[in-house]
Amino acid sequence: MITLTTRTTPRLNRIKIRKLVVDIQDVESTELYGAFTREHARMIIKFIRNLPECITDLYICCSKGGSRSTGCAAALMLMSNRSDDDVWKNPYYTPNYLVFRELCREFGIDMSDEAVSDRLRINDEAYKTAQKNKNAGKYERWQILM
């Protein structure tokens, strides 16, 4: 389990699974307090690399399940040679592009600002289409099984 939030609870320790808590705010500027950094990205990559091969499911969450976790999930999908379309084309998610970009870059995936902008446009179009079809605004938590 990867948790990207400033809100932690002692109850999390009751869960006897491998977990990484990354203490970050949901901000998309490196200038803001609590922003995701390359050090955070290295922590996540190290955590993923150290998982035993028998681990087949990965739960990624944040406070509300739509931004930091989806940015992380999209990057991890690319890292595992999968498409990240399921994240960017989902109108219920607004992936945190700082989390996504820094994770990709730290892993060695060529992720230019233009490539990130293209994905943000795809996500924005998905939301506008859902709104037009009166299918936006529903809340859905993110869970990715890898």
Where do the protein language model's features map onto the residues?
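Helix-loop module immediately N-terminal to the HCX5R catalytic loop
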Residues: 20-59, 92-93
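A phosphate-binding catalytic loop at a beta-strand-loop-alpha-helix junction
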Residues: 58-75
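Short catalytic/ligand-binding loop motif for oxyanion handling, primarily in non-cytosolic enzymes
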Residues: 10-11, 30, 66-71
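Short, glycine/charged-enriched secondary-structure capping and boundary segments
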Residues: 14-16, 73-77
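Lipid deacylating catalytic domains
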Residues: 12-16, 39-40, 117-121
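Glycine-rich, flexible N-terminal cofactor/catalytic loop recognition
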Residues: 1-22
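PTP/DSP superfamily signal
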Residues: 49-57, 76-146
